[in-house]
């Protein structure tokens, strides 16, 4: 009996020992840390595009910053001087009266300087003031008495065909004087060097440009407009809007305005009309044009017309809307300066 009891006690002891060992193993398993593989996340660096620069007079974006000084050239707009060379490269074209209702063109080149510009024509005092405000290097051939004094006193950096005819300025055999004076890009640059003029851009206009042409489509529909200087059809401009390109073509007497250098039509993103006082000052019909006081204006872009104002902002004629610079569509602009008499109501008409 006693021997059997010992056997049972031994069996119980063995079972208890086994149970304790199993419990310890379970506890060990519970406390043993489980190592998990960590997923390595590699953050991709954002791909940066090239830095873009906005051209000061067109608002067009480019990978190259243009710091070239602007050049302003007086270009002949007589019918015998058409088509003109270089106007397709102008950032801005100003058209305004020179004698009576005969207009001249002031072509502003900053983004591009064409290989040839012309025919070059004579200066007026208000042309020189416009150049001064833009800090542009001014190119003309001839001058009115007031403009002559300003240019000879170096009111603006300039070269004139009266001093450089046959050297910097060349005569075309295709046309007769005064419709045949031209200047090349190389000679403009040579003229800047000869007159010790700066070649660097120093004046930035207060122009404002839209991000998208779609943002411009607020106003009256105007797919065609006509701008008149008196009743002479030779100085009446007709513009038609090309919705596919988002630009205007210009015509005079049914002939499309092209650049003679490449025979391509001049394409414009904005047409501006500035109304101001004009006064005839001599028997030749020369004008005094008020470019200081500001006044009423009209803006045509994206097939839309808007009533605006204009002001002389630091010497630069600037379109304004509700007290701030009017937003333009990026691209080239043609500015018509017309007389308050008869006014824009007569000088400008447009149709949907």
Q: Where in this protein do the model-derived segments appear?
A:
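Bacterial N-terminal signal peptides that target proteins for export
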Residues: 1-9
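C-terminal motif of bacterial Sec signal peptides marking the signal peptidase cleavage site
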Residues: 15-19
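Bacterial signal peptide processing site
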Residues: 21-24
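A surface/extracellular/periplasmic glyco- and lipid-processing/surface-interacting theme
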Residues: 28-46, 53-68, 72-90, 99-352
């Amino acid at each position: 009996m006693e021997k059997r009891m010992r056997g049972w006690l031994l069996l119980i002891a063995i079972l208890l020992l086994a149970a304790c060992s199993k419990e310890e193993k379970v506890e060990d398993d519970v406390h043993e840390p489980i190592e998990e593989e960590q997923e390595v996340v590699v953050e991709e660096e954002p791909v940066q595009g090239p830095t873009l620069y906005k051209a000061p007079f067109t608002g067009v974006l480019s990978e190259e910053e243009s710091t070239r000084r602007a050049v302003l050239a007086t270009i002949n707009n007589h019918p015998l001087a058409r088509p003109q060379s270089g106007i397709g490269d102008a950032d801005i074209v100003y058209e305004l009266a020179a004698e009576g209702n005969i207009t001249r063109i002031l072509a502003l080149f900053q983004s591009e300087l064409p290989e040839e510009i012309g025919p070059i024509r004579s200066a007026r005092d208000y042309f020189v003031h416009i150049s001064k405000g833009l800090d542009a290097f001014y190119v003309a051939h001839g001058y009115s008495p007031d403009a002559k004094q300003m240019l000879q006193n170096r009111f603006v950096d300039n070269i004139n065909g009266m001093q450089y005819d046959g050297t910097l300025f060349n005569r075309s055999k295709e046309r007769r004087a005064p419709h045949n004076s031209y200047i090349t890009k190389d000679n403009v640059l040579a003229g800047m060097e000869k007159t010790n003029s700066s070649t660097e851009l120093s004046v930035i206009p207060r122009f404002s440009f839209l991000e998208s042409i779609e943002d411009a489509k607020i106003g009256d529909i105007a797919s065609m407009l006509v701008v008149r200087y008196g009743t002479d059809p030779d100085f009446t401009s007709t513009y038609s809007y090309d919705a596919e390109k988002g630009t205007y073509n210009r015509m005079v007497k049914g002939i499309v305005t092209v650049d003679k250098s490449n025979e391509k039509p001049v394409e414009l993103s904005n047409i501006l009309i500035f109304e101001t006082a004009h006064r005839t000052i001599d028997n030749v019909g020369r004008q005094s044009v008020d470019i200081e006081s500001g006044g009423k204006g009209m803006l045509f872009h994206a097939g839309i017309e808007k009533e605006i104002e204009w002001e002389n902002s630091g010497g630069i004629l600037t379109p304004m809307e509700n007290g701030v610079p009017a937003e333009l569509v990026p691209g080239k602009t043609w500015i018509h300066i017309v007389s308050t008499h008869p006014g824009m109501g007569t000088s400008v008409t447009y149709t949907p």
